[in-house]
């Protein structure tokens, strides 16, 4: 279904107020609440696009070619400035970063751009007169896993470490350009990292392994494990992990077609295994019992990749989660601390017309 609609990838901006859609027909930019298309780059301008990344709600967009009819190479990141007034639309391409291998992901903040390849990560100053500040060798990272703290106070970068199942954290503000920083590693899982995310302040990192049954949260300063959340018992591929803006909740989506919502601020809201009330159990069962299960969940099309994030709070006791799927569907659910979860909105974002420039 994703191929029918031609969606190659989806990504939220830094505060999850917008998302960009890389397509066989170009790029579309959407506002989340209310849902509306804010702009697009058509196929004549950019060809088919594999990846796109937004810088907050600005006019700057990073694109990487790919798909069936690309105009641009998969080894280049192009920066598109939609606010630039030019006669030829091609002149809106203001920057280009080119490498020797395919670009797998791009992350941006107000002063830096991060470009992720399979075995290397590059950090440049951005957007004025970009200069390469750092490069980091990584273990095989075929999904281009990486997250960057958007906070003005903290310049934290996280990506899979050299050791299987580990996370590497780099404070870009404490690292001198051209030098390699001392490794700051968290041994998070026994198998390969499959998904990771930082909260908005960069104080907590969440990760899941390829097994996909557990999500573990760590303090980025002390490296201590804070909590272990159980998505389920069957292996799954996690597509996305996101924190609420105040880090009170966490949501996660997987190929099981379920979006799980966990409480972080008040973990007593999360469900526990019935065995937790039994008392002492063996070490293997004990790990299962000690885990916290989601306080609420909802379903989206199974095996359809989707990204999820928290919406605007409608009241003190009502929160919302947005799920955006590559099949073109938009889902909004509201949930309460007692675990009630109900659909509030459903739409097909690919059928929404252009509203404005972005």
Curated annotation (Swiss-Prot):
Keyword Repeat: yes
Function as written in the Swiss-Prot or TrEMBL entry: Component of the autophagy machinery that controls the major intracellular degradation process by which cytoplasmic materials are packaged into autophagosomes and delivered to lysosomes for degradation. Binds phosphatidylinositol 3-phosphate (PtdIns3P).
Stretches forming WD repeats: 2-40, 188-228, 233-272
Recorded family membership: Belongs to the WD repeat PROPPIN family.
Domain of life, source organism: Eukaryota
Subcellular location, record wording: Preautophagosomal structure
Protein name in the entry: WD repeat domain phosphoinositide-interacting protein 4
Motif (L/FRRG motif): 229-232
Transmembrane segments: none
GO BP term, example: autophagy of mitochondrion
A Pfam family it matches: PROPPIN
UniProt cross-references to InterPro entries, sorted A to Z: PROPPIN, WD40/YVTN_repeat-like_dom_sf, WD40_repeat_dom_sf, WD40_rpt
């Amino acid at each position: 279904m994703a191929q029918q609609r031609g969606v190659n990838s989806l990504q939220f901006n830094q505060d999850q107020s917008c998302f960009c859609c890389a397509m066989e027909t170009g790029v579309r930019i959407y506002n989340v609440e209310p849902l509306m298309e804010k702009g697009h780059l058509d196929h004549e301008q950019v060809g088919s696009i594999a990846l796109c990344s937004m810088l907050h709600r600005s006019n700057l967009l990073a694109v990487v070619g790919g798909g069936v009819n690309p105009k641009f190479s998969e080894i280049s990141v192009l920066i598109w400035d939609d606010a630039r007034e030019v006669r030829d639309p091609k002149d809106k391409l203001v920057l280009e970063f080119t490498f020797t291998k395919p670009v797998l992901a791009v992350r941006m903040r107000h002063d830096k751009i991060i470009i992720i390849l399979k075995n290397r990560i590059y950090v440049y100053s951005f957007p004025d007169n970009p200069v390469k500040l750092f490069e980091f060798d990584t273990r095989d990272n075929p999904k281009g896993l990486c997250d960057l703290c958007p906070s003005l106070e903290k310049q934290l970068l996280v990506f899979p470490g050299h050791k299987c199942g580990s996370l590497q954290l780099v404070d870009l503000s404490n690292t001198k350009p051209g030098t390699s920083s001392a490794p700051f590693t968290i041994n998070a899982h026994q198998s390969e990292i499959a998904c990771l995310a930082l909260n908005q302040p960069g104080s907590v990192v969440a990760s899941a392994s390829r097994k996909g049954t557990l999500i573990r949260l760590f303090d980025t300063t002390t490296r201590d494990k804070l909590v272990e959340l159980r998505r389920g018992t069957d292996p799954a591929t996690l597509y996305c992990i996101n924190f609420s803006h105040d880090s009170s909740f966490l949501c996660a989506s997987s190929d099981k077609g379920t979006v799980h919502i966990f409480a972080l601020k008040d973990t007593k809201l999360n469900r526990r295994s019935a065995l937790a009330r039994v008392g002492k159990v063996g070490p293997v069962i004990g790990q299962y019992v000690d885990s916290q299960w989601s306080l609420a969940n909802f379903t989206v099309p199974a095996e359809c990749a989707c990204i999820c994030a928290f919406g605007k709070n409608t009241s003190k006791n009502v929160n919302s989660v947005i799920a955006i799927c590559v099949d073109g569907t938009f889902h909004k659910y509201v949930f309460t601390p007692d675990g009630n979860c109900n659909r509030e909105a459903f739409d097909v974002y690919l059928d929404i017309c252009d509203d404005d420039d972005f």
